[in-house]
């Protein structure tokens, strides 16, 4: 395919135009008085949102250079959202301000590489200042405040704080759609994995279609079970004890499955068969987790254990197990606390050493299942459009609250960035590096200015006023008053603010040091010709 190439100022200005179109659409959502944006969908109802990354993802521009510029800024929003769950709009506003200021200097003859070095040194200093400003999250109220700001809803914030209080900072908080209106929180202690019963005949409550086993034995096997002959010796021992049995295996099929189902229907023996979660090595690891949690052993030929020779003391125990068609929840496993703690530390070490985001995410899930409980926030709404938007806001707010616990909180509303700019006095830079640092100093004002503008106020005046207030004080844009931000609960996780700045600076440096842009040449749409043997294609019928 043919390419088109632009150089120097033409290349940079093309990228900037694309970035400005995207940033202008996103920045109207910033702050408590930010507006919404409506996104048209190819199918179904349009989506209404004030989430920066959702808006950014929808923007596709026609001009090839502008398209590349918009894609670069999308990356800022996406990266910030992935890391911290919020701050996407702040990151976009910072990137736009940095690029605008930087390109002005490049056009005036500044050396782009020196500007880049100045920007990087300034951002490093400001990031350090933000972490120094950060206060540890100590109370449930602080978690509620930060989640409420992210979700723009105090009820959601309080529910997330309640969930984190119950399951701990490493616990799993999932968001599900509910058929009923409103919000509810469901807590499960112990482990939940997303595999349900193999046959609906195992259900003990036919109305809710779930199976509930009290004080069961738990057989954990890393193999398929199809022959009843292999299973019989163990079944007889469990039947003698009078306890129910949960079987977690790669699969249970054939006569083994039919024997279990027939005995369950006749009421002779209560059991449930469930497929093991995960695949390959991950399945092996998760079965090991379940074994440690329940005090059992994984029956696998790899370790010399065969099903037909297995004794009852290799089985795990739990206070209760609830199984639906989609998931299994093991409550209060009988494993030793020391062994569980050892396994948790082992998984933490694996997370530290892993360089794959996917592996790290899966290890984090395993850690959460072992170390914390599981909290499910069920969200309902009047329409499908509102439900999608609400669910997305809750998911972002959960990540935001976890970020607050991780690195602490700073004053929100763009105030932390303004007050972190005091570090510029200590930076000893010269020439174009100093110019690059100055671009960062000016860009730090952009989020507060935009919040003020969205609230119908004069941005420049507000920035000067806030700069002269005591540390931690700033503008409450919802009321127009100047307050102690942290005391009022107007806070941001330090991780969100830091990530927004670092990602914005990273893209800005790329913009400034770009000397050529190579893009696909737009294809002209071919005029539709007439079918063979027909007269001219533009005839009027």
Swiss-Prot record:
Its EC number(s): 5.6.1.7
GO terms for cellular component: cytoplasm
CDD domains, alphabetized: GroEL
Source domain of life: Bacteria
Residues reported in the UniProt entry to bind ATP: 29-32, 86-90, 413, 476-478, 492
HAMAP family the record matches: CH60 (MF_00600)
Similarity comment: family membership: Belongs to the chaperonin (HSP60) family.
Function recorded in the entry: Together with its co-chaperonin GroES, plays an essential role in assisting protein folding. The GroEL-GroES system forms a nano-cage that allows encapsulation of the non-native substrate proteins and provides a physical environment optimized to promote and accelerate protein folding.
Quaternary context: Forms a cylinder of 14 subunits composed of two heptameric rings stacked back-to-back. Interacts with the co-chaperonin GroES.
UniProt protein name: Chaperonin GroEL 2
Organism encoding this protein: Streptomyces avermitilis (strain ATCC 31267 / DSM 46492 / JCM 5070 / NBRC 14893 / NCIMB 12804 / NRRL 8165 / MA-4680)
Phylogenetic classification of the source organism: Bacteria, Bacillati, Actinomycetota, Actinomycetes, Kitasatosporales
GN (gene name): groEL2
């Amino acid at each position: 395919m043919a390419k088109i190439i632009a150089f120097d100022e033409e290349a940079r200005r093309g990228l900037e135009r694309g970035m400005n179109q995207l940033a202008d659409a996103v920045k109207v959502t910033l702050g408590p008085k930010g507006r919404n944006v409506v996104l048209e969908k190819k199918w179904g109802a349009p989506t209404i949102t004030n989430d920066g990354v959702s808006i950014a993802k929808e923007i596709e521009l026609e001009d090839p250079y502008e398209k590349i510029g918009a894609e670069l800024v999308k990356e800022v929003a996406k990266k910030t959202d992935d890391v911290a769950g919020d701050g996407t709009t702040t990151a976009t506003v910072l990137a736009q301000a940095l690029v605008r200021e930087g390109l002005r200097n490049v056009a005036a003859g500044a050396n782009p590489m020196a500007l880049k070095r100045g920007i990087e040194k300034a951002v490093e200093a400001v990031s350090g200042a933000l972490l120094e400003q950060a206060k540890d999250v100590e109370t449930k109220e602080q978690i509620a405040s930060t989640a409420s700001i992210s979700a723009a809803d105090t009820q959601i914030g309080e529910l997330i704080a309640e969930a984190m209080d119950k399951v701990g900072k490493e616990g799993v908080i999932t968001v599900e759609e509910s058929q009923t209106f409103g919000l509810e929180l469901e807590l499960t202690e112990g482990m939940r994995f997303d595999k349900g019963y193999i046959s609906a005949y195992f259900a003990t409550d036919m109305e809710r279609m779930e199976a509930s086993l009290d004080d069961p034995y738990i057989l954990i096997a890393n193999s398929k079970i199809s022959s009843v002959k292999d299973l019989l010796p163990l079944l007889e021992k469990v039947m003698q004890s009078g306890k129910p049995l949960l079987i977690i295996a790669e699969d249970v099929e054939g006569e083994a499955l039919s024997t279990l189902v027939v005995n369950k229907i006749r009421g002779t023996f209560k059991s449930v068969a469930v497929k093991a979660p995960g695949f390959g090595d991950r399945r092996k690891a998760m079965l090991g987790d379940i074994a440690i949690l329940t005090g059992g052993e994984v029956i696998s030929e790899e370790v010399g254990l065969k099903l037909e020779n297995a004794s009852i003391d290799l089985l795990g125990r739990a206070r209760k197990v609830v199984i639906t068609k989609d998931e299994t929840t093991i409550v209060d496993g009988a494993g030793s606390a020391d062994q569980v703690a050892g396994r948790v530390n082992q998984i933490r070490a694996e997370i530290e050493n892993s360089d794959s985001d996917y592996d790290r995410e899966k290890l984090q899930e395993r850690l959460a299942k072992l170390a914390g409980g599981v909290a499910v926030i069920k969200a309902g709404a009047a329409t499908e459009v509102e439900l999608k938007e609400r669910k997305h806001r809750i998911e972002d707010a959960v990540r935001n609250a976890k970020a607050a616990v991780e690195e602490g909180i700073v004053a929100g509303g763009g105030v932390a960035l303004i007050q972190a700019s005091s570090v510029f006095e200590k930076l000893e830079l010269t020439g174009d590096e100093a110019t690059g640092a100055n671009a960062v100093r000016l860009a730090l004002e952009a989020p507060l200015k935009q919040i003020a503008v969205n609230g119908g106020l004069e941005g420049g005046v507000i920035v000067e006023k806030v700069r002269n207030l005591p540390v931690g004080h700033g503008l409450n844009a919802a009321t127009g008053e100047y307050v102690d931000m942290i005391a009022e609960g107007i806070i941001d996780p330090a991780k969100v603010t830091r990530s927004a700045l670092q990602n914005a600076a990273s893209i800005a440096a790329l913009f400034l040091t770009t000397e050529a842009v190579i893009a696909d040449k737009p294809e002209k749409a071919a005029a539709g010709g007439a079918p063979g043997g027909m007269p001219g294609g533009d005839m009027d019928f």
